[in-house]
């Protein structure tokens, strides 16, 4: 029986949309009255993306104390069901083949740097001989070809796959599984349970719950929130908005959402236009790398800063500190980029690994802001505070120099 992994962290939608995806979004629910056909379509999309069972699951997982080393969140697990991997146990350094969706945004670039530093450690210890990587550049067709290339090459001891999209990538992932070599899927999911382990943080609904609850606690009924979203069709991002919108509606918060394409200029324009219509009390984002542009729109308009949720990207954290606004930095744990390699180490030793490896996902609060700014002092604005690579040999210079392998 197949277990659908697409609900939690995967990409869904047309490749043309995915080319724009940084790491964010879902179909909006509110749109101008003159765009009735679009509004109708988006309402249908919102209904499609909301899943009460998964919402409840992720709501509860936020309060679960993870199991595993306290100082190694990338090895921690939440409610793990373990899988026997004795069939894959063997000695000697292994060659891994990594089919990556892309490194097209700061979040993925930060993770890619961390992954390569972890790889060096495992190469030095004789666990991995090399990791051949192919970058699909946000293309389903390219990633399918990449996986098929690895299979035809016949030279992979194990596969790591960060899928570009869900349904389209499922057959290719299944073909990798059919080789009899271990497959680890991470970040985004597919519609098959053939992988030895599927690794991801708690998920999009958890993000939506954390962020909307924060705004609701700091606003009052009738206040207006502008939700800034990159594009439709990415399920983990769709779920961020679906979860947040549900709670906004229940609290009587007026939430209007806009797709931005991840463009800071467009973000600034959208917020400026909304401010021209009237007061805006809150800003909600499904990814924080355009947060500074949103804040600048308030500054340019001479308006009071909003209550705001961004992300753990340093550009937002620094602007949050500088302005003193009421903020929260949700996190889609970037340290997960280490976990697939460490999972493979366990698999080749024949050790148990979680079938679904759910990693912790906790926002950065105002009380923690100074701590994370200090810990990441000297890092570039595109760096993510909870990257989890402080114990790796290249720290901090490799991340400070933003060396993209």
Residue ranges and their predicted role:
Residues 2-3, 23-405:
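A residue-level marker of the well-folded mature domains of exported/periplasmic proteins
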């Amino acid at each position: 029986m197949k277990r659908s992994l697409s609900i939690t962290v995967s990409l869904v939608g047309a490749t043309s949309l995915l080319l724009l995806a940084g790491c964010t979004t879902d179909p909006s629910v509110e749109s101008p009255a003159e765009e009735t056909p679009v509004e109708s379509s988006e309402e249908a999309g919102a209904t499609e993306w909301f899943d009460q069972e998964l919402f409840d699951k992720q709501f509860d997982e936020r309060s679960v104390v993870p199991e595993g080393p306290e100082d190694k969140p990338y090895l921690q697990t939440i409610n793990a069901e373990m899988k026997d991997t004795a069939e894959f146990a063997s000695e000697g350094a292994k060659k891994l083949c990594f089919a990556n969706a892309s490194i097209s945004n700061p979040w993925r670039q930060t993770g890619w740097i961390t992954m390569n530093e972890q790889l060096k450690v495992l190469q030095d210890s004789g666990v991995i001989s090399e990791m051949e990587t192919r970058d699909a550049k946000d293309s389903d067709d390219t990633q399918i070809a990449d996986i098929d290339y690895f299979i035809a090459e016949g030279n992979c001891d194990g596969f790591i796959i960060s899928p570009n999209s869900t349904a389209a990538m499922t057959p290719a992932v299944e073909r990798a599984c059919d080789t009899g070599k271990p497959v680890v899927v991470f970040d985004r999911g597919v519609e098959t349970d053939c992988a030895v382990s599927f690794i991801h943080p708690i998920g999009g609904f958890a993000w939506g719950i954390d962020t909307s609850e924060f705004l609701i606690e700091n606003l009052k009924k009738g206040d207006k929130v502008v939700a800034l979203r990159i594009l439709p069709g990415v399920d983990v991002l769709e779920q961020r908005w679906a979860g947040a919108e549900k709670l906004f509606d229940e609290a009587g918060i007026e939430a209007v959402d806009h797709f931005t394409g991840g463009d800071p200029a467009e973000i600034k324009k959208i917020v400026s236009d909304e401010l021209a219509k009237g007061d805006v009390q809150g800003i909600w984002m499904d990814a924080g790398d355009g947060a500074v542009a949103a804040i600048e729109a308030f500054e340019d308009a001479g308006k009071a800063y909003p209550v705001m949720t961004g992300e753990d990207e340093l550009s937002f954290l620094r602007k949050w500190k500088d302005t003193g606004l009421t903020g929260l930095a949700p996190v889609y744990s970037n340290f997960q980029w280490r976990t697939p390699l460490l999972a493979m180490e366990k698999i080749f030793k024949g050790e148990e690994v979680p079938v679904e490896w759910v990693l912790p996902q906790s926002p950065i609060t105002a009380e923690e802001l100074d701590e994370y700014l200090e810990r990441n002092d000297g890092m570039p604005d595109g760096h993510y505070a909870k990257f989890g690579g402080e114990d790796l040999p290249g720290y901090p210079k490799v991340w400070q120099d933003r060396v993209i392998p």
